[in-house]
């Protein structure tokens, strides 16, 4: 409030004074400084009512916003150009108010809503893939396993990764076909190699049901080889040429294994 009264006093004194010679203007030069005014104070209604919209002798500059107000010089053009160099000078006693008002002028940076619709914003969203999509196939296989097991009224605690560890592939090799008193023949063939799953289910009446998935040839052809022999009897060999292999599930019912299990259970001691 004291700063406001001081500024009003200076404005009223400068508005009433008449132009004086150069010697008197030099005496008033210390009063012709730049005063730091708060923007909220300049725009307040009470300040305009006390001072007026446009005080006498004050020029409004709308070229660029500034925190400083310069009072006009009544001297010549040479002195005005010299004072323009000091138009950005801040009084030492006004620096205290400048530091106190920095917090009011420093506003947080607001993000425009247009930036949220930029392509880079959505590209980053698309790059971050939800983690559950990576295991979508595993969850689906687990669901199908429980669904198929429920139809048989049996829920098997089998992990899905154990079911997908089956490997069965063809490995090329050179197969030699030989016979007594005949020339050996080399044939390019494939063998089945891999690891397939299997499980064993005990059944009623000591019967055991074994479900084995074996790595077997699924695509093959039979080839007849005529061997060159010294005997008068022709020798023909029949060879399976394997092209593809896969895990094939087979159900085996072995009563011999059932009898072995009953013998094993009969030898166990009874526990009360």
UniProtKB/Swiss-Prot annotation:
Residues 168-253 form the CTCK domain. Residues 1-19 form the signal peptide. It comes from the Eukaryota. One of its GO terms (biological process) is ureteric bud development. GO terms for cellular component: extracellular space. Induction: By SHH signaling both in the head and in the trunk. On the left side in the head was also controlled by NODAL. Keywords: Cytokine, Disulfide bond, Glycoprotein, Secreted, Signal. Cytokine that acts as a regulator of the activity of Nodal/BMP pathways during the establishment of bilateral asymmetry in the head and trunk of the embryo. Belongs to the DAN family. This is Cerberus.
